[in-house]
Amino acid sequence: MSSSEEVSWISWFCGLRGNEFFCEVDEDYIQDKFNLTGLNEQVPHYRQALDMILDLEPDEELEDNPNQSDLIEQAAEMLYGLIHARYILTNRGIAQMLEKYQQGDFGYCPRVYCENQPMLPIGLSDIPGEAMVKLYCPKCMDVYTPKSSRHHHTDGAYFGTGFPHMLFMVHPEYRPKRPANQFVPRLYGFKIHPMAYQLQLQAASSFKSPVKAIR
C-alpha cells in the first residue's frame, strides 16, 4: 500500500480478499485508550501495531528492517481483529454490521426450511487461535462453516461468541421467527418413528458375531 493511494490502513485491510466480514472500526474508537484495555498484553509489538492501524509514521528502524515490518503487520491484523470484536458490540458497530447483514454480505443459511435466511459471523471462542469464524443463523439458531474457503482462515475471536445475540437484543425487530417447517424422514411415504434409529442401534450393539472355533 503506497502513501500516494491515500487509503487508510483500516480501509485497505477491510478491502482485502477474505476480510469481507469485517466492518471499518471508527478511528476515534481506536484512539480511546479505554476501549483497548488489556490488549497490550495479548498482542506483540502492540505500540507499533497500533501506530500502523492509525496510519502514524513508522520508526526508521522498522522501515529498514523488512522482517520486523512483517511481524508488525501480523500484529496489526491481530490487534485490529480484537478491537473489531469489541467495536461490533457497540451501537455504532452494530449499526454497521446490521447493514451488512441486511445486504446478505455474510451469506445465507444452507438449511432448506430457513428459506435463505441471512446469517451473522460468530466465534466459537473468544481466545485468538482456537477456532475460525463460523456463521450463525438466527432462524434455526445453528452455526455453519462459511461457504467460501477464503473465509476459513479468519479467526472467530475477531467477532466473538456473543455478537449475534447482542445485535438481536439491541434490535429485536430484526430477529426472525423460528422455521415453520421441519424435515420429517419418510420411507415409502410413512414417517419414520423417532425411536426407530435408537432401537436399531440397540439391536446392533447387542448382536454378537459367532466366534470361530480354533483348530
From Swiss-Prot:
PROSITE patterns, sorted: CK2_BETA (PS01101)
Sequence motif KSSR motif, residues: 147-150
Origin superkingdom: Eukaryota
Subunit relationships: Casein kinase II/CK2 is a tetramer composed of two alpha subunits and two beta subunits. The beta subunit dimerization is mediated by zinc ions.
Entry-linked Gene3D superfamilies: 2.20.25.20, protein kinase ck2 holoenzyme, chain C, domain 1
Record's keyword terms, sorted: Metal-binding, Nucleus, Phosphoprotein, Wnt signaling pathway, Zinc
Gene this protein is translated from: csnk2b
Xref: PANTHER family: CASEIN KINASE II SUBUNIT BETA (PTHR11740:SF0)
Pfam family, one: CK_II_beta
Name under which the protein is recorded: Casein kinase II subunit beta
Record function comment: Regulatory subunit of casein kinase II/CK2. As part of the kinase complex regulates the basal catalytic activity of the alpha subunit a constitutively active serine/threonine-protein kinase that phosphorylates a large number of substrates containing acidic residues C-terminal to the phosphorylated serine or threonine. Participates in Wnt signaling.
Organism ancestry: Eukaryota, Metazoa, Chordata, Craniata, Vertebrata
Record-stated family: Belongs to the casein kinase 2 subunit beta family.
Post-translational modifications: Phosphorylated by alpha subunit.
Protein location: Nucleus
One GO cellular component, as annotated: cytoplasm
